[in-house]
Amino acid sequence: MIEKCIGAHRFRRLQRFMRQGKVTILCLVLTVIVLRGTIGAGKFGTPEKDIEEIREHFFYTRKRGEPHRVLVEVSSKTTSSEDGGNGGNSYETFDINKLFVDEGDEEKSRDRTNKPYSLGPKISDWDEQRRDWLKQNPSFPNFVAPNKPRVLLVTGSAPKPCENPVGDHYLLKSIKNKIDYCRIHGIEIFYNMALLDAEMAGFWAKLPLIRKLLLSHPEIEFLWWMDSDAMFTDMVFELPWERYKDYNLVMHGWNEMVYDQKNWIGLNTGSFLLRNSQWSLDLLDAWAPMGPKGKIREEAGKVLTRELKDRPAFEADDQSAMVYLLATEREKWGGKVYLESGYYLHGYWGILVDRYEEMIENHKPGFGDHRWPLVTHFVGCKPCGKFGDYPVERCLRQMDRAFNFGDNQILQMYGFTHKSLGSRRVKPTRNQTDRPLDAKDEFGLLHPPFKAAKLSTTTT
């Protein structure tokens, strides 16, 4: 009927259009079904609800994506900041100063206008207190053998790292050197890194520490102070303890330079022995008043420069104060002070280090004097500071030589030596053997007689 009305050709076109329309409608239905499954069409499935939920879905997706991008950006920035600012896993790029920011402002100097500085409460009966303690604690004798006092070697460094990149490495070498000597000679060692009194910084920091250790360790007969820039270079030399039986303070120095000339370098306080006694506590009390930093130390420095021979103008230091104290009050203190010049309790590095090869060729360790110095002290090098009084390269090379000079005496016990005094590398000095106890200990350091315990030996 329709074909007759519109014609055969148009009828076929209409049929084709209807077939295509069915396919289009079918695709549309399938699309809606898929969208309803993925996006959702609400509880009722109405067109209005479909449109509303589609709109909410895309709004939620956009809203959720924005904070995600923010988090990604913040995370990226944080990672970048950690890697760049703090160094991440790299010690090389990490700013070490962040770890050493002081917890608070430095302690302010107290007003000393009317009251002199004191190291602590006045003690007047220390000899009696100590004697009673030793009687009550016989297992901690102050002498470990006849003429062999119990000795505590004390040294230390600042709480913070050195101000130059290699300073801490040389501090490590220095303490290793001291540990070696103390182990061989049966000496206890204490390494300090705490500033016990902020007023007594710098040269003077040792005084509060020394007093505290004397009072805390009554079993110690002698305290041996040694600066961190001093090294043992004669590992064999044993101090002549018998020589000091009537003395309480032993320092490297010369009577004429201290008492007659009042020369500020007439003695050295970088390495000295102090007996644990009431006399020593009184000396520390008399020594300390020039130490507080600030105006007191500055004014005291002017007095010392005026009174002592050849002293430059700078704030009061512990060495100049000791020279001044002994020179002006010799009757009170001089009788118990031994100024040692028979060996190098302190040896100035500038006149010693270049002669090490000559010493090796002509002498052996055990003298402690100019032939083989007990201590080589690098005065003025200041290996932990920013600036020294001598060229840095010269100081560091000479410190390496001094360390190796002493270290060779340790290594020889085990059959090794440094290839040269300037070399870190070592070489064997003897062949290995299946009878190691037959190996020769050239300097007698493996089992020195002064370390032998008076005990019976049992074997199983």
UniProtKB/Swiss-Prot annotation:
Transmembrane segments: 21-40
Lumenal side: 41-460
Family matches, as Pfam families: Glyco_transf_34
Recorded topology in the membrane: Single-pass type II membrane protein
Result for mutant: K206A: Reduces activity 2-fold
Effect of D318A: Reduces activity 40-fold
Protein name: Xyloglucan 6-xylosyltransferase 1
